[in-house]
Amino acid sequence: MKVAVVHDWLTQIAGAERVLEQILAIYPEATLFAVVDAVAPDQRGFLAGREVHTTFLQKLPFARRHYRHFLGLMPLAIEQLDLSAFDLIISSSHAVAKGVLTGPDQLHLSYIHSPMRYAWDLQHQCLRESGLERGVLSWLARWQLHRLRIWDQRTANGVDHLIANSGFIAGRIRKIYRREATVIYPPVDVDAFAPGAPGTRSGDFYLTASRAVPHKRIDLIVDAFAQLPTRRLVVIGDGPELKRLRQRAPANVEFLGYQPVTVLRDYMRRARAFVFAAEEDFGIVPVEAQACGTPVIAFGKGGVRETVIPLEAELAAASRSVAVGGGRGVAPRGDAGAAT
């Protein structure tokens, strides 16, 4: 049986790439495809030396670095991949990978990390954050997203079996595509994030860790700690928002930028609690924190509702608020005080 694995774009190692790594481990002889491949040489270990077959976008100027600017061309690009020689196609999709063309004698399984939120429920937020609420460019962007929604919904019908990474995403698939999906949670290496030796939890700080991008809502956490000057927050992660976050942060917030997993794990083991404000599709990092025995304070929406056990005194906030801080928390070892 010939197997093809199709991923949206290869530019970094995040949750979707961890899933891809496990799919490739299950099918070591599979051929790998992606819209573009721009993973740095020192981060390609998860590909296990595989050649990546890309689309015509790989050859366009600036496409590997500014691949998101070519979103309007990606449906066309993904449809140009010739997969007719394969029996099984597995797409790992949060954008366009599920749109590959397949025939009646081929089986197409698609692991959906999320439908394209920037084209659906987050369109207005994304346009606002990009400064595209008004003007000619705004209308061009809205037209492009409109076309993308039509294509996205149509191509969902070409998938034989949809797989969601959480019940939350299965609900979104049901809403957008009007199809049912099997839930298979992403892999989390909980053994690597086991609790430290007794007495490890000696830190006087709270921790958050993620890419510094708007939807992770690190800004909300920073603003919350601005109102808690006696509590220290450590932020791990790099991204385009990091400079702006540093400029608005109070003295009790420390930014460490990108750190290797060994450093992240050490901070997780020592933190009083892990703080998480994103509405994530699944949310791997809160699971890693809990594997370290660290309490989690989380915004009570998204995949975190399937991985974090709420305290009895949970604040059931329907929206994010610095003043209320509504969320969910789990307090392993009975340390309820760390999640209040």
Residues covered by each model-derived region:
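Membrane-proximal helix-turn-helix segments that form the acceptor-binding/catalytic region
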Residues: E129-L162, A170
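Short glycine/serine-rich donor-binding loops of glycosyltransferases
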Residues: G283-V287, V304
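Carbohydrate-associated surface elements
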Residues: F168, P187
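Active-site donor-binding segments of glycosyltransferases and PAPS-dependent sulfotransferases
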Residues: I26-K98
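Conserved donor-binding/catalytic core segment of Leloir-type glycosyltransferases
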Residues: G196-K216, V222-L228, L233-V234
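Nucleotide-activated donor-binding/catalytic signature segment of Leloir-type glycosyltransferases, i.e.
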Residues: K243-D266
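Acidic donor-binding loop of glycosyltransferase active sites
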Residues: R269-D281, T294-P295
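Short hydrophobic beta-strand element within catalytic cores of glycosyltransferases
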Residues: P295-A298, R305-V308
